[in-house]
């Protein structure tokens, strides 16, 4: 048996096409979705990520606003910029590119973003809402993973899913989304003593641990669907290349479907950032309309 390779690029293109259609509908109603991206410093990887996000936004018809601050900027300067963007009704989404310089508190900066404009889904109000099953802006990578799983598996109800990793960005929200889809969910991490044995029972494995090729075929139940969130740069025969947390070639003979690295989850993350931006624009427009109607009713 050779696993089906899940094409994240093609899936992301379909999501972005839908986003583009939604943007056109909003623009016809006088609403122009706008995404503000804040980049502090000039980290090379962050530069690439920001460039890709802005390019995808422009392709989808979303107005992008890039705000650059020097690496030596103070926490207060970052917070002041966030406050300015929070107050700007023409800005629907705010993305703070991570990591921040070491002298800054990431959590404090993320908490300063208006939850309704928090298109990364990192604000505690959105995190709490997700855990309660409320309709909130959810983290982009787990949302993209869920889309790939639903396209691949259909109904996920009753499936046993194992999430490897418990980060706030991927592991925890991934587990919450799988629970919402009525999966039985197990989270394993660096302190788990039986991680491999638990993975061997899983219908779905989501790897987000940040260790290159950590999981090979011996970890997998035959026929498991494998989502590899890991992005690790390694030296291979004198060349630098990207690999995931899954030993891809080794796992192909056991899994029924698997995402590659690159070309799997990565494109979905950016696609769902655009989707969140459009969702935020729509929700803000509805809120403003409701507020205007309420004012009219009270004064007319």
Curated annotation (Swiss-Prot):
PANTHER family: C-1-TETRAHYDROFOLATE SYNTHASE, CYTOPLASMIC, C-1-TETRAHYDROFOLATE SYNTHASE, CYTOPLASMIC-RELATED. GO terms for cellular component: cytosol. It comes from the Bacteria. One of its GO terms (molecular function) is methylenetetrahydrofolate dehydrogenase (NADP+) activity. Catalyzes the oxidation of 5,10-methylenetetrahydrofolate to 5,10-methenyltetrahydrofolate and then the hydrolysis of 5,10-methenyltetrahydrofolate to 10-formyltetrahydrofolate. Its EC number is 1.5.1.5, 3.5.4.9. Keywords: Amino-acid biosynthesis, Histidine biosynthesis, Hydrolase, Methionine biosynthesis, Multifunctional enzyme, NADP, One-carbon metabolism, Oxidoreductase, Purine biosynthesis. Homodimer. NADP(+) binds at residues 165-167, 190, 231. InterPro entries: Aminoacid_DH-like_N_sf, NAD(P)-bd_dom_sf, THF_DH/CycHdrlase, THF_DH/CycHdrlase_cat_dom, THF_DH/CycHdrlase_CS, THF_DH/CycHdrlase_NAD-bd_dom. Belongs to the tetrahydrofolate dehydrogenase/cyclohydrolase family. This is Bifunctional protein FolD 2. SUPFAM superfamilies: Aminoacid dehydrogenase-like, N-terminal domain (SSF53223), NAD(P)-binding Rossmann-fold domains (SSF51735). It comes from Pseudomonas savastanoi pv. phaseolicola (strain 1448A / Race 6). Pathway: One-carbon metabolism; tetrahydrofolate interconversion. It catalyses: (6R)-5,10-methylene-5,6,7,8-tetrahydrofolate + NADP(+) = (6R)-5,10-methenyltetrahydrofolate + NADPH; (6R)-5,10-methenyltetrahydrofolate + H2O = (6R)-10-formyltetrahydrofolate + H(+). It holds the Pfam family THF_DHG_CYH. One of its GO terms (biological process) is purine nucleotide biosynthetic process. Disulfide bonds: none annotated.
């Amino acid at each position: 048996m050779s696993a089906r390779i899940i094409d994240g690029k093609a899936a992301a293109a379909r999501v972005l096409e839908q986003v583009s259609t939604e943007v056109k509908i909003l623009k016809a109603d006088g609403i122009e979705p706008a995404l503000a991206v804040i980049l502090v410093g000039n980290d090379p990887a962050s530069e690439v990520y920001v460039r890709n996000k802005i390019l995808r936004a422009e392709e989808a018809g979303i107005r992008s606003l890039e705000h650059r601050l020097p690496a030596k900027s103070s926490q207060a300067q970052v917070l002041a910029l966030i406050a300015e963007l929070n107050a700007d009704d023409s800005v629907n989404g705010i993305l703070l590119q991570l990591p921040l310089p070491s002298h800054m508190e990431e959590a404090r900066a993320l908490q300063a973003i208006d939850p309704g404009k928090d298109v990364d889904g990192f604000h505690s109000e959105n995190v709490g809402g997700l855990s309660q099953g409320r309709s909130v802006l959810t983290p982009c990578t787990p949302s993209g993973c869920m889309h790939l799983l639903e396209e691949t598996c259909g109904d996920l109800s009753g499936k046993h899913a194992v999430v490897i990793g418990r980060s706030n960005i991927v592991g925890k929200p991934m587990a919450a989304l799988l629970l919402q889809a009525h999966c039985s969910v197990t989270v394993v991490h660096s302190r788990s003593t039986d991680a491999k044995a638990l993975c061997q029972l899983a219908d779905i494995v989501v790897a987000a641990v940040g260790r290159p090729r950590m999981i090979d075929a011996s970890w997998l139940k035959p026929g498991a669907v494998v989502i590899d969130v890991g992005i690790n740069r390694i030296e291979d025969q004198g060349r630098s290349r990207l690999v995931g947390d899954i030993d891809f070639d080794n796992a192909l003979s056991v899994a029924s479907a698997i995402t590659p690295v690159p070309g799997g989850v990565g494109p979905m993350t950016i696609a769902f950032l655009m989707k969140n931006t459009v969702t935020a624009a729509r929700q803000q427009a509805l809120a403003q309309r409701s507020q205007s109607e309420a004012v009219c009713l009270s004064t007319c």
